[in-house]
Amino acid sequence: MEQDKPFNHRPSSSAREARLVAASADEAMVGLGLRMHRFAPGDCLGDVPRLRREVYFHERGQFGDRSKRVTDGLDACGTTLAVEKGTQAIATLRLHDFAPLAVQVEYGSLFQIDAFARSWPLAQVAVGTRFAVQADQRSKPVVDRLMEEAYRWAQESRIQFCLLACEPFLHDVFEHYGFREYLPPAILPGGVDLLRMVLVIEDEPFLSECGSPLHRLIRDPARALPAKAWLTRSFNALS
């Protein structure tokens, strides 16, 4: 606790509002027969590998050694989110910060993480991967809940930037939540484009402008100001 600030046992209005929003979202999930599951690093992922396999391979008609391709070593050090219906996972996203060397090795070049490392602790820069939503569950309430839980994880972890890479057909989905491209697309072998996008946590003006469902979760808009200014200078990404 900072010594020059008196202790206030009453939670701030923004914190109280965030808890009320979370409770409301939880009630809505229950009404839909859904629940949110956060798998901590090292936890068994339950039904998540099946969902990944279904989306990544069955939908695309790709088969082969699926067991190795739907899980990897980074599952053990990441936080995996899942929206569940009954015993089935219907939407999932994996989250890491960039402090672990394995995450830097796997994703650092793609996201130009060295530029972030010169100005920010890598524990404040996160990446979202392994996004998958079951085909018959691709509705706004399901994806909203997944992204809201990811945002809460970022707030709890004191993340400043959340990065992700997606194919162009998902651009509008992530833009709706407040992500923007900050680098030109990466071209993968085979000519596949990957859009490199960033969400500045607590960026109140932009989340309001784009109508992001995450706007109501903002607790401390001032935290975004230096992060947004730095990103603009470093990548000419934001206006």
Give residue ranges: language-model regions.
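Sequence-level motif detector for i,i+2 pairs with an aromatic at +2
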Residues: 31-34, 78, 90, 123, ...
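Acyl-donor binding region in acyl/amide transferases
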Residues: 106-200, 205
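Acidic/histidine-enriched, glycine/proline-rich intrinsically disordered or flexible terminal extensions
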Residues: 205-239
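Conserved GNAT-family N-acetyltransferase fold
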Residues: 81, 93, 131
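Short, His- and charge-rich active-site/binding loops that engage polyanionic ligands
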Residues: 85-117
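Acyltransferase donor/substrate-recognition loop-hinge adjacent to the catalytic core
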Residues: 16-24, 116-119, 203-209
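Short amphipathic alpha-helix that is part of the acyltransferase structural core
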Residues: 21-75, 79-84, 89
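Short acidic N-proximal helix/loop "leader" segments that mark the beginning
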Residues: 1-31
